[in-house]
Amino acid sequence: MNNKMKFMCTALTASLFLAGCGNMGGMDANGLLSAGADMAKAANLSDADIVQLSDAACKQSDQESKIAPAGNKYSKRLTKLMRGFGNMTLNGQKVNYKVYLTEDVNAWAMGNGCVRVYSGLMDLMNDDELRGVIGHEMGHVALGHTKKAMQTAYAVSAARQAAGAAGNSVVASLSASQLGDLTEKFINAQFSQSQETAADDYSFDLLTQKKMNRKGLVTAFQKLAELDGGQSSMFSSHPSSPDRAARMQQRLDAGK
């Protein structure tokens, strides 16, 4: 994920509730209770809830983005390089992918199998490097990191809006503005250092399993290091891009 993507749910309800109170002047007690209930619900979102929210958030993002059409050079290239992964599923969800036409250098994946790659990233990297990055993003889904990020995005959106219609569906409980806020929070989330490292390893192991070139992970981080001066990466500020490149090279040298 970009150097925006990372949240954690530790002490979530208390910290978000207190942080949000300063902006809740004039809200009645029922409104505050509703916000607290939504935040508590976020920590207990089921896998089915995550898929449902991801479906809605991905659709929202697609509507707000310029998607490369099927005949576009970026779409053709992504389709070709994704063939190496075969019929991938993430936690039982079939992977679906699209390209956003934007100069931003980014990519992300959601719990419903939604994978989105930005053309700015595709301009920067070759196919092996892109497979490494995409494998990393899919790793966040497979390892449960995106579930935590979606739980937090849901809680933050509920806290900011402090409202939501009653209903059985977590999506139905969100207004259109809340859904937009949730989508933005998820895409701009950040993962912990340990999660980023685990996603790197997932991608390396996936590329190994699929018999694809793992060197792309090394050179992808090297390019990001040049892009950001070696201080951070599109995924995270910790560990740094050079450190991650070196770690992947060590795994290559060790033959595992």
Model-derived features: positions:
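A Zn2+-metalloprotease active-site environment signal
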Residues: N2-C9, L16-K256
